[in-house]
Amino acid sequence: MIVLGIDPALGNLGWALVAKEYTKLKYLASGTIKTHSKDEIHNRLAFINSTLEKVILKYQPNIAAIEETFINTNSVTSLKLGYARGAIMSLIGRYNLNMQEFKPNTVKKTVTGYGHAKKEQILYMIKHLIPGTDLITNSDEADAVALAYTSLVTKKY
């Protein structure tokens, strides 16, 4: 079972792949898809889509775990995040992956035991929970690993 964790964003999208073999978790890969705010939005979304598609084709995940969005006080920011999620969900649908959505507090509680944990705490815990993640320093990638971990430990496969 391979889960693709996705921390959706328009500027810095984090992704990570974690596999589960019997009861053992294995980190496979992670990365950040960066787009520039000065580029046109349709080009940014196309870049996210094509880059994430390469990840899906290379690793063949079974499931995509994506963070649910919350409504930001800045409606433009929320709308742009919605665009990114739409592009991601379209790709997930195109490759017929099972999709799971998790609230940020659920992910934090699953990984750290505390639903309001800081990014540093998530980063610290994933390094202790999943072998091979000790070189991750980026919070976007750490969040994506945490999403994949949450999927693997809370769902029955």
Curated annotation (Swiss-Prot):
The RuvA-RuvB-RuvC complex processes Holliday junction (HJ) DNA during genetic recombination and DNA repair. Endonuclease that resolves HJ intermediates. Cleaves cruciform DNA by making single-stranded nicks across the HJ at symmetrical positions within the homologous arms, yielding a 5'-phosphate and a 3'-hydroxyl group; requires a central core of homology in the junction. The consensus cleavage sequence is 5'-(A/T)TT(C/G)-3'. Cleavage occurs on the 3'-side of the TT dinucleotide at the point of strand exchange. Its EC number is 3.1.21.10. Homodimer which binds Holliday junction (HJ) DNA. The HJ becomes 2-fold symmetrical on binding to RuvC with unstacked arms; it has a different conformation from HJ DNA in complex with RuvA. In the full resolvosome a probable DNA-RuvA(4)-RuvB(12)-RuvC(2) complex forms which resolves the HJ. It is found in: Cytoplasm. Pfam families: RuvC. It is an enzyme of class 3 (hydrolase). Belongs to the RuvC family. The active site is at D7, E67, D140. It catalyses: Endonucleolytic cleavage at a junction such as a reciprocal single-stranded crossover between two homologous DNA duplexes (Holliday junction). It comes from the Bacteria. Mg(2+) 2 binds at E67. SUPFAM superfamilies: Ribonuclease H-like. The lineage of its organism: Bacteria, Pseudomonadati, Pseudomonadota, Alphaproteobacteria, Rickettsiales. This is Crossover junction endodeoxyribonuclease RuvC. Its cofactor is Mg(2+). Binds 2 Mg(2+) ion per subunit. PROSITE patterns: RUVC. Keywords: Cytoplasm, DNA damage, DNA recombination, DNA repair, DNA-binding, Endonuclease, Hydrolase, Magnesium, Metal-binding, Nuclease. GO terms for molecular function: crossover junction DNA endonuclease activity; DNA binding; magnesium ion binding. One of its GO terms (biological process) is DNA recombination. InterPro entries: RNaseH-like_sf, RNaseH_sf, X-over_junc_endoDNase_Mg_BS, X-over_junc_endoDNase_RuvC. Mg(2+) 1 binds at D7, D140. GO terms for cellular component: cytoplasm; Holliday junction resolvase complex.
